[in-house]
């Protein structure tokens, strides 16, 4: 993949299931990967010397990441990523989401990684199958798709430690068709 529209170039191969990717303002590729042992937020860089891929976040507070499902980058360099559920990662994203739809545990979370500070903070918890992320055109609102609750939550992109459906977490769209 080349952001400049040039020739195709294979820049990486990943072990596991690539579940989402997004380019940041610098042209770096951020991706979420799920392996049987857990998830990883990775960054791939490509320049005239070649490609480098690094696992940036693989655990939070000493616990391995669950099943990662989505990534979105902001113009300020911050990287938002979703853990769909705390269900076991060994069978991949589809299996984890199916399990969440049946069990409805609401253990999905959205985090933000700040590359300049090298910190991870929780933005939103209590999501029943976080499956997608998007920033508004003005980059002030983060949208989170919630498969289990069949809705899209909207939160301030700078908010921290919110709960799905709680204070300062609005339902942008609800009653979506689903399971």
Regions found by a protein language model. Give the residues of each.
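A short beta-strand motif characteristic of beta-propeller blades
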Residues: 6-12, 52-61, 119-124, 166-172
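Conserved beta-strand positions in repeat-built beta-propeller and related beta-rich domains
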Residues: 1, 23-24, 29-37, 79-89, ...
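Short loop/turn segments immediately following beta-strands, especially the blade-tip
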Residues: 44-49, 155-162
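A short loop-to-beta-strand structural motif that recurs across blades of beta-propeller domains
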Residues: 1, 17, 40-42, 108-111, ...
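Beta-propeller blade signature
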Residues: 43-48, 101-115
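Asp-box/WD-like beta-propeller blade repeats and closely related beta-sheet repeat scaffolds
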Residues: 35-75, 81-89, 93-98
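Beta-rich, blade/repeat-based domains predominating
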Residues: 14-33, 61-79, 104-109, 123-141, ...
């Amino acid at each position: 993949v080349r952001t400049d529209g040039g020739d195709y170039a294979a820049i990486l191969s990943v072990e596991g299931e690539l579940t989402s990717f997004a380019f940041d303002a610098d042209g770096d590729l951020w991706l979420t990967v799920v392996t049987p042992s857990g998830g990883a937020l990775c960054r791939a860089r490509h320049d005239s010397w070649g490609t480098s891929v690094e696992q940036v976040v693989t655990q939070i507070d000493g616990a391995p990441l669950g099943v990662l499902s989505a990534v979105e980058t902001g113009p300020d360099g911050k990287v938002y990523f979703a853990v769909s559920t705390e269900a076991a990662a060994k069978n991949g994203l589809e299996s984890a989401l199916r399990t969440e739809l049946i069990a409805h545990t609401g253990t999905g979370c959205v985090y933000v990684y700040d590359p300049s500070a090298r910190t991870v903070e929780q933005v939103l918890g209590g999501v029943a199958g976080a499956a997608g992320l998007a920033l508004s055109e003005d980059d002030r609102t983060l949208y989170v798709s919630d498969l289990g609750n069949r809705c899209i939550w909207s939160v301030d992109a700078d908010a921290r430690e919110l709960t799905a459906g709680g204070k300062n977490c609005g339902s942008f769209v609800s009653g979506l068709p689903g399971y």
